[in-house]
């Protein structure tokens, strides 16, 4: 099973950007979404993210993530409609203010979740960690912790699937449509998953220590990450995106 944040090789301009600039572009889109207050701007930022994903060849993964987020966005919309009492009543307990606020919150949720995932799809985690150390002067231990946590996401997913398959072979039915019953079935799986995660974390820490983890500096990487003309142009575009979010 392909994880949604796995690196997708490619030779597009998005792939060739400095990893720090990719993070800056993703952050600019997210900030612009939070600053925006119109449907045009929110939909525009969402469309921009999907267009970048299509250009990089990862739009299918973005749509799969979008499908997972839509139910959560709908729940947020229902909560906004239920508890927002300001404005004029449109129908029943629904007010125009609640409808507008809830729909914008849904668009923000969908728009904020995609940019960072997109940048992770087109960036190797080793390059991301080393670029943060070299360009941003982030201590290597923090960059390593962040990228290692991302690497563990698919590992834990595979562990959970293996545990569920073992329990299914014993007659446990996880395909129930009752969410409360499914939650009760899933909670006991957290214990073996936690034990497995602690073991993997301890093994990773020992391996890193034996390889001289604490001796590593920004000069330890053989690969350099200079800021080129294309990177500067993208940074200027990122600033413009924040300005657009502020104005609209």
Language-model features, listed with the residues they occupy:
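Juxtamembrane/interface alpha-helical elements of multi-pass membrane proteins
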Residues: 69-173, 180
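Buried hydrophobic packing residues in well-ordered domains
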Residues: 18, 62-63, 119, 153, ...
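Alpha-helical transmembrane segments and their membrane-interface exit regions
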Residues: 48-58, 72-78
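Transmembrane alpha-helix interface motif
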Residues: 1-41, 45-48, 162-248
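Membrane-helix interface segments
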Residues: 39, 58-59, 138-142
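Interfacial helix-loop-helix linkers and transmembrane-helix boundary segments
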Residues: 58-67
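Hydrophobic transmembrane alpha-helix segments characteristic of membrane transport
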Residues: 46-52, 127-131
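Structural signal for the C-terminal ends of transmembrane alpha-helices
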Residues: 35, 51-59, 122-123, 246-247
